[in-house]
Amino acid sequence: MSREITFFSRFEQDILAGRKTITIRDASESHFQPGEVLRVSRNEDNVFFCQIEVLSVTPVRLDGLTEQHARQENMSLGELKQVIKEIYPGLDELFVITFAKR
């Protein structure tokens, strides 16, 4: 059985174009393993749009996010931190999942 991950629809085009190559998640989604292939769907309607391969899963604190992380998310560092705070309010311990579209 294939494992799945969802993304907000606003990220779909960046993932498909290879502009978004990481996702930052909380501990509940830190269990993915390098080499694992995931089905990717939109969070809002659960419509499948591609597969990704997990390359790495690395812990990071909110204040440890860098311009490099922001580039991999296809946004500025300020935008990235704001999005993370909206999705995970009050959470500081996160995980960077690096992936490649298949």
UniProtKB/Swiss-Prot annotation:
GO terms for cellular component: cytosol. Its EC number is 3.5.1.135. Keywords: Hydrolase. The active site is at K20, T23, E73. It catalyses: N(4)-acetylcytidine + H2O = cytidine + acetate + H(+); N(4)-acetyl-2'-deoxycytidine + H2O = 2'-deoxycytidine + acetate + H(+); N(4)-acetylcytosine + H2O = cytosine + acetate + H(+). GO terms for molecular function: hydrolase activity, acting on carbon-nitrogen (but not peptide) bonds, in linear amidines; N4-acetylcytidine amidohydrolase activity. The keyword Hydrolase applies. NCBIfam families: PRK04980.1 (NF003443). This is N(4)-acetylcytidine amidohydrolase. It comes from Serratia proteamaculans (strain 568). The lineage of its organism: Bacteria, Pseudomonadati, Pseudomonadota, Gammaproteobacteria, Enterobacterales.
